[in-house]
Amino acid sequence: MNTQLPSFIALYRALIATPSISANDGALDQSNERLITLLAGWLSDLGLRVEMQPVPNTRNKFNLLANYGEGAGGLMLAGHTDTVPFDEGRWTRDPFTLSEQDNRLYGLGTADMKGLFAFIIDTLRDIELHKLNKPLYILATADEETSMAGARYFAASTALRPDCCIIGEPTSLKPIRAHKGHLSEAIRITGQSGHSSDPARGVNAIEIMHNAIGHLLTLRNTLQQRYHNPAFNIPYPTMNLGHIHGGDAANRICACCELHLDMRPLPGMTLNDLNELLNQALTPIAAQWSGRLRIEHLHPPIPGYECPRHAPLVQAIEQLLGERAEAVNYCTEAPFLQEVCPTLVLGPGSIEQAHQPDEYLSTDFIVPTRTLLTQLIHHFCQR
């Protein structure tokens, strides 16, 4: 046992006490460098080789890659180091102070998902790493909660090809082998303002948007009829019209109207295909009102993800846990890390706690998670 390292709870406390919020708003966004440096020190103390990787086009964000052992294959344990911002008015405790009450560990990132690294490091202190005959990798990424820039950059730049990767997102220790993607778009209509007493002298953007929404709802129905995957509780792609704003006064012809929509494609649907379907749906509007319709990404799109049920990784994890791998509707970094090697999502904590005030992880997960991590390392690195 490595006695130089802090205790499990002390590791957890230090992680939660180190803010690493990612946000599109620059006023809220924070570098994760302090957290990455903290992890680097602990992993180095365990004897792993550590590399800090600056992530391009971010606000001073870093990935960390640590490894023990050389050669082909092996296991990668992955997680993100950032959290969402917090609503101070809805939290009843300090989000950056780990507190324990009623068998729960409270704090921002306890479940989603900085706490994972406390589990990994605490498990590694009891592993005889010199007995591993395949490499073990620990990947800590940046900006999962916004652009997924860390995972995108790692997948695009690494030459590593482990046998498999486990992303420790909070899944209540149930294996996840597939999830939908995410496309978030802004539809903007530019009209021509004027006095409401003479409608013919203007172009009402709200009226054009009304017609555009009709075409979007037709597309939504088409997606439901054309695509189907029974692995999902909601087995078709979804579209949500989530936000709309237009105009500034009742007596003024609306000059601009903007709609924000969310689409969740199934695995196997390419983002290019989905964009093409969206553009085709709005082609009649664009043709009738030349130059007045624009479509923009609100966030970088995320493709769907699936690790086939017959994949050796899925078979091994299902046998290890005695549970079938499932499909979910939320997104993770899996589609990007799947480009590197077969990937599953499996970790402690409940997804119901993600992005919630007074976020917590039940202490019931502590022993099973340590056991699972030990089993994973022995299975994939000592074969």
Curated annotation (Swiss-Prot):
The active site is at 82, 144. GO terms for biological process: L-arginine biosynthetic process. It catalyses: N(2)-acetyl-L-ornithine + H2O = L-ornithine + acetate. Zn(2+) 2 binds at residues 112, 145, 355. Zn(2+) 1 binds at residues 80, 112, 169. It comes from the Bacteria. GO terms for cellular component: cytoplasm. Its EC number is 3.5.1.16. GO terms for molecular function: acetylornithine deacetylase activity; zinc ion binding. CDD domains: M20_ArgE. Its cofactor is Zn(2+); Co(2+); glutathione. Its main location: cytoplasm. PANTHER family: ACETYLORNITHINE DEACETYLASE. Belongs to the peptidase M20A family. ArgE subfamily. Homodimer. This is Acetylornithine deacetylase. It comes from Edwardsiella ictaluri (strain 93-146).
